Amino acid sequence: MLDIQLLRSNTAAVAERLARRGYDFDTARFDALEERRKSVQVKTEELQASRNSISKQIGALKGQGKHEEAQVAMDQVAQIKTDLEQAAADLDAVQKELDAWLLSIPNLPHEDVPFGKDETENVEVRKVGTPREFDFEIKDHVDLGEPLGLDFEGGAKLSGARFTVMRGQIARLHRALAQFMLDTHTLKHGYTEHYTPYIVDDTTLQGTGQLPKFAEDLFHVTRGGDESKTTQYLIPTAEVTLTNTVAGSIIPSEQLPLKLTAHSPCFRSEAGSYGKDTRGLIRQHQFDKVEMVQIVHPEKSYETLEEMVGHAENILKALELPYRVITLCTGDMGFGATKTYDLEVWVPAQNTYREISSCSNCEDFQARRMKARFKDENGKNRLVHTLNGSGLAVGRTLVAVLENHQNADGSINIPAALQPYMGGVAKLEVK
């Protein structure tokens, strides 16, 4: 959520920055709401002053034996009380309308984010590794994976399209990847591992910005009868739960940064993605991801963003996978981000790079929603900055390992860094 004081003091500048990311901020609507709010507040202050003045007169009138005049004054105070209640209701209505609108407004892009309308105008930062030149006809991960235990028909039979069953060697490789990622982040990068719920309420999703904007992208569950019926949601990413662990908190500054990680399934309806990536693991309703979250001092957040990109890169390097880093342009950034880097891994069968990690700085956008603060060196409570990044998407990493490390006979070479997690197995072979 944007800072309302910033909106009030720099409305035109905020509107201009939002326009850079393709959001049309309705300044006329905002000005009208502000006028209504100010009008009600002025009326409230006038009523309160009048009530206080008349209340003082009542005692004096009674002391002078002027009971009829005192009664008239008491009737006036009673009417003022009614008027104040109405003014409070009017102010509450204006504030609720303003708050609901603020929840739908995206974050402001950082000044150094490249301007662009969509993903075609993202900017490549660097490429790492050289895509392998194969001397045989390559297969995609579906054809490679099915003989090794990747079962798309089984997933569809159980749950419908975009679900997958894994068994045997593939299931073990999938688990090994997640464990390797977690160990790297906890043992080498200093994150604390978490296990968090997979089902959350709407307040939690509002805190990280998924609600109310992206309700159609979420899976929800309903429980209880008619009177006690409640709706909750399956998490689209562990960013939601990890970040919300500090909701409502005041963190001593010496405890920052907080570095959190978790391996979890993620559930997404993929609304608007009909017909895209219908083959294979690239786009699933349920997929696993190892998430990184950092809660930091505001002055450290952009330094931390670069650090988190490096943490994700370390996984790709260890797995010997070619990749590139790109800066998302203003028109392609996520709702809550001020700046985002995507890491894209080389997918040989598609002859292109595909997203495998997204690392974002949200500055105080999420913290303001969650009321997540820290106490600075002067004892003042200030909003923290929050960052999140994939470290990595496990299914897409599996795709990359299968395709980049395939052999002509359909076997898969296991990267050396991953072999200890596979019981020393150096190659997956069709049995």
UniProtKB/Swiss-Prot annotation:
InterPro entries xrefs: aa-tRNA-synt_IIb, aa-tRNA-synth_II, aa-tRNA-synth_II/BPL/LPL, Ser-tRNA-ligase_type_1, Ser-tRNA-synth_1_N, SerRS_1_N_sf, SerRS_core, tRNA-bd_arm
Class of the enzyme per the UniProt entry, highest EC level: ligase
Cellular localisation: Cytoplasm
Coiled-coil region list: none
Reaction(s) catalysed by this chain's protein: tRNA(Ser) + L-serine + ATP = L-seryl-tRNA(Ser) + AMP + diphosphate + H(+); tRNA(Sec) + L-serine + ATP = L-seryl-tRNA(Sec) + AMP + diphosphate + H(+)
Biological process terms in GO annotation: selenocysteine biosynthetic process; seryl-tRNA aminoacylation
Annotated residues for binding of ATP: R268, S269, E270, E355, I356, S357, S358
Molecular functions (GO terms): ATP binding; serine-tRNA ligase activity
This protein's GO CC annotations: cytoplasm
Record: residues binding L-serine: T237, A238, E239, E291, S390
Protein origin, superkingdom: Bacteria
Cross-referenced Pfam families: Seryl_tRNA_N, tRNA-synt_2b
Primary role: Catalyzes the attachment of serine to tRNA(Ser). Is also able to aminoacylate tRNA(Sec) with serine, to form the misacylated tRNA L-seryl-tRNA(Sec), which will be further converted into selenocysteinyl-tRNA(Sec).
Domain free text: Consists of two distinct domains, a catalytic core and a N-terminal extension that is involved in tRNA binding.
Family, similarity comment: Belongs to the class-II aminoacyl-tRNA synthetase family. Type-1 seryl-tRNA synthetase subfamily.
Protein name per UniProt: Serine--tRNA ligase
Organismal lineage: Bacteria, Pseudomonadati, Pseudomonadota, Betaproteobacteria, Neisseriales
Protein encoded by which gene: serS
